[in-house]
Amino acid sequence: MTRQTFFYLLILLVFSSCSIDSEISSLKISPVLIDSNINIRAIEIKNNKVYSATSNGSVLYFDIDKSDVISEINYEIENDSIVPNFRSLALTENDVFAMSIGDPALLYKNGNVVYKETHPKVFYDSIEFWNDNEGIAVGDYTDNCISVIITRDGGESWNKLDCSVFSNIKDSEGFFAASDTNISIIDNY
């Protein structure tokens, strides 16, 4: 998907998700960012801002009312010059979390690594928070178990759940490359 197509779809999503009492007589769609090299894999909207995580290690955001100004959160590249390939993104009231795919899996909080996991098959697919302190990230099957990490301290530290907490996991079962769409938090649970 090209960057231009993404932003046309994003604008359409923003307009279609708003509640409008009056009939719309016209619609003007304006591109926010046109870049054929961008690969956006995760989108979050909060407080009138649109955040997106890219495959080239960037988290971009813009205010819906000021879409001509796009800002970028810079991420340290400290792991053998590996550019993080972000597949998932989560927001709390004050923090932005982005998680990379592949080995090593890197979880960033506001641009700093807060969790790192190395394994030839490591691949985290999705991350979400159900409040400002508690969150979850899920990933593919490694070492005969699905991958789930949890935070209870606002994302400062993350703990991988032991396989014994899961029952009846089938061989190679997991969450699999759904680009940040395989967790849904309902009513703070």
Regions found by a protein language model. Give the residues of each.
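Positively charged n-region of N-terminal signal peptides that target proteins for export
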Residues: 1-5
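C-terminal motif of bacterial Sec signal peptides marking the signal peptidase cleavage site
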Residues: 16-17
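Asp-box/BNR beta-propeller loop motif
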Residues: 23-38, 56-80, 103-121, 148-168
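Signature of short aromatic-glycine-proline-rich micro-motifs recurring in repeat-based ectodomains
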Residues: 40, 86, 175-182
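Repeated scaffold domains used in trafficking and secretory/extracellular systems
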Residues: 40-42, 83-89, 122-128
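Entry beta-strands of beta-propeller and related beta-repeat scaffolds
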Residues: 49-50, 95-97, 133-137, 189
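Short loop/turn segments immediately following the C-termini of beta-strands
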Residues: 55, 101-103, 140-143, 188
